[in-house]
Amino acid sequence: MSANDRRDRRVRVAVVFGGRSNEHAISCVSAGSILRNLDSRRFDVIAVGITPAGSWVLTDANPDALTITNRELPQVKSGSGTELALPADPRRGGQLVSLPPGAGEVLESVDVVFPVLHGPYGEDGTIQGLLELAGVPYVGAGVLASAVGMDKEFTKKLLAADGLPVGAYAVLRPPRSTLHRQECERLGLPVFVKPARGGSSIGVSRVSSWDQLPAAVARARRHDPKVIVEAAISGRELECGVLEMPDGTLEASTLGEIRVAGVRGREDSFYDFATKYLDDAAELDVPAKVDDQVAEAIRQLAIRAFAAIDCRGLARVDFFLTDDGPVINEINTMPGFTTISMYPRMWAASGVDYPTLLATMIETTLARGVGLH
């Protein structure tokens, strides 16, 4: 559809959420916030949920159903709407078709897909590949950057190859479950043991003695067979949002800081899943209280990191600010969009409110179009 045709009506946006990963519930909560903040005067929004088993369903675009209530996490349930599919055929023009009993009936045609999926089977390049095959414009990073950003090992490798500062780490692939002596000496204690391709701090453990490592690896492997062991970095936890504009230029947001010392009365506390989403225990400072010169250096590093993995659309870049300078922890190509998430909060502090932020992402997607870039 041409830009002139779109000017005559609202842009139809499919917000896709849920999915097969262990971050299903957080994806739902992010989608609820996005549905609440998309400008209905400009966008005709439909909601497509993916169940934990992988079925796609057309659901009511009701953000109130996509919230955490009394610590109960939302979920896309089978039978909650009409099952549908997106044919991998660019000639279909973004058509969503029904599965039996109304086999092949066109339910909706969309201009843009907003894949608000966190974790594997969504944020890792898989749905991006499907959307490329279907010839449908979509918000966010492409296949390569999504896959790299999801994999902590390859994120660090690409950033280091581009001369960007990253922390020390080791990778454990099956059947290996222990570190070599030289790796233990290089990393030191404590270390953080994580699923290599996961987010929301699910499956993450802090290890303060090497005899705790096997249990931490086993815990991480409940979510991913590949495990990354990262040296603990002493420093402030800072974040920066990067946003691509419709003309292709990149902007970096005001910084935010996460402070988790003493959460739930534990000296070894860190920003885990419960702290992030259930306990409301961490303190989030936006804007972060950082020297202007240091803040600008971090913003420039965020833009360099964004470019290093060939990212598009948006990303959140996480840092540790140490006595020796900033260190990049990771890049999140589809950051959280919940009411407490740092990405929209940092942009709000930068003068870009939530509806404008979402509109900019969609405008950038439409300007970019489909195909190789």
Curated annotation (Swiss-Prot):
Regulation: Is inhibited by the antituberculous drug D-cycloserine (DCS), which is a structural analog of D-alanine. Is activated by K(+).
UniProt-listed InterPro entries: ATP-grasp, ATP_grasp_subdomain_1, D-Ala_lig_Van_CS, D_ala_D_ala, Dala_Dala_lig_C, Dala_Dala_lig_N, PreATP-grasp_dom_sf
Positions bound to Mg(2+) 2: 330, 332
Summary of subunit composition and partner proteins: Homodimer.
Cofactors (names): Mg(2+); Mn(2+)
Location of this chain's protein in the cell: Cytoplasm
NCBIfam families in UniProt: D_ala_D_alaTIGR, PRK01372.1, PRK01966.1-4
Gene3D superfamilies from the UniProt entry: 3.40.50.20, ATP-grasp fold, A domain, ATP-grasp fold, B domain
Other observations noted: Follows an ordered ter-ter mechanism. ATP is the first substrate to bind and is necessary for subsequent binding of D-alanine or DCS. ADP is the final product to dissociate.
Lineage of the organism: Bacteria, Bacillati, Actinomycetota, Actinomycetes, Mycobacteriales
Function: Catalyzes the ATP-driven ligation of two D-alanine molecules to form the D-alanyl-D-alanine dipeptide. This molecule is a key building block in peptidoglycan biosynthesis.
Chief site of localization: cytoplasm
GO molecular function, one term: D-alanine-D-alanine ligase activity
Protein EC: 6.3.2.4
Ranges where the ATP-grasp domain occurs: 156-363
GO cellular component: cytosol; plasma membrane
GO biological process: cell wall organization; peptidoglycan biosynthetic process; regulation of cell shape
Protein's name in the database: D-alanine--D-alanine ligase
Pfam families hit by this protein: Dala_Dala_lig_C (PF07478), Dala_Dala_lig_N (PF01820)
Organism: Mycobacterium tuberculosis (strain ATCC 25618 / H37Rv)
Pathway(s) where this gene product acts: Cell wall biogenesis; peptidoglycan biosynthesis
Cofactor note (record): Binds 2 magnesium or manganese ions per subunit.
Keyword line: ATP-binding, Cell shape, Cell wall biogenesis/degradation, Cytoplasm, Ligase, Magnesium, Manganese, Metal-binding, Nucleotide-binding, Peptidoglycan synthesis
